[in-house]
């Protein structure tokens, strides 16, 4: 299975819809496992504050914050594919979180890989913009 640019960009949106549902508490029981399934077992990220985070830590973050941001809205825009091979895509996008407490905007760069015939997120780097 070769990775397709449009599917990679759609994955950004699908994943962030699930994140918004989980954080807002407006999610179904299957949404958290579906969200975690987007990530490769070896996934790691560097969050916007500069901390290195493993898949287990990301999973814990989602589990522990279910319903704790009822007013969160996540908007994704400026998606660009930087590099594409048959089995990997590097892309960037801007992510805007709006809550009653304020707005956070970050620019992210992610690596998606084909693993066992599925598109999985392997790496993510976030940088605060505002």
What is the predicted role of each segment?
Residues 2-11, 17-29, 44-130:
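A beta-strand edge to alpha-helix "cap/lid" segment located at domain peripheries
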